[in-house]
């Protein structure tokens, strides 16, 4: 079923690492959502529960890509996640840092695919690059709104309810193994 020799590329090894990063991001967003739920901030909680599913779907898109390329896939464990936040802004800042880190990882994946002459891999990464521009922009805006709102958390809740509702499935997104949730 799988070609174990295909994992010999640096790009495929980095995809395996990225699967771990995406699953970790999913769990981190669940931890952030639970924090917001516990603080009675339902709009922020709902937003981050949805973000957790999105990150899970990203991991499964990477899995599907490796399966489609006949590369053996190993589902990894995850890195530790942070569960303790002093303020809602701290949780949002962590989410922004996480998105910036993922952007660096995705950019590296695209560069390695190009360096290795893996045109299929490079093309596959283009959707993720576009997605990261959107994710960093959204988290940057959310942190700025939190800064402007100060201690009035209802302003943040109102903004999230009004401006950050789910956009629906992206028809250009890669297929996720097992289907997107």
Curated annotation (Swiss-Prot):
Binding residues for Fe cation 2: 55, 99, 132
Enzyme Commission no: 1.16.3.1
One GO-annotated biological process of the protein: intracellular iron ion homeostasis
One Gene Ontology term, aspect cellular component: cytosol
SUPFAM superfamilies xrefs: Ferritin-like
Binding-site positions, Fe cation 1: 22, 55, 58
Keywords, sorted A to Z: Iron, Iron storage, Isopeptide bond, Metal-binding, Oxidoreductase, Ubl conjugation
Residue span, Ferritin-like diiron domain: 5-150
Catalytic activity: 4 Fe(2+) + O2 + 4 H(+) = 4 Fe(3+) + 2 H2O
Enzyme's top EC category: oxidoreductase
Domain of life from the UniProt record: Bacteria
Molecular function in Gene Ontology: ferric iron binding; ferrous iron binding; ferroxidase activity
Cross-linked sites for Isoglutamyl lysine isopeptide (Lys-Gln) (interchain with Q-Cter in protein Pup): 10
Subunit comment: Homooligomer of 24 subunits that are packed together to form an approximately spherical molecule with a central cavity, in which large amounts of iron can be stored.
Function: Iron-storage protein that displays ferroxidase activity, catalyzing the oxidation of Fe(2+) ions into Fe(3+) ions, that can then be deposited as a ferric-oxide mineral core within the central cavity of the protein complex.
Protein name: Ferritin BfrB
